[in-house]
Amino acid sequence: DPHHDFMRF
């Protein structure tokens, strides 16, 4: 889900 792209770490 691109909304959570900031969590991709």
Swiss-Prot record:
Q: Which UniProt keywords apply?
A: Amidation, Neuropeptide, Secreted
Report any one BP term from Gene Ontology: neuropeptide signaling pathway
Return the GO cellular component terms, semicolon-separated: extracellular region
Its predominant location is: secreted
Q: Which residues carry this modification: Phenylalanine amide?
A: F9
Transmembrane portions of the chain: none
| Location in or out of the cell | Secreted
What the record says about family reads: Belongs to the FARP (FMRFamide related peptide) family.
In Swiss-Prot or TrEMBL terms, this protein is called FMRFamide-14
Q: Which species is listed as the source? A: Sarcophaga bullata (Grey flesh fly)
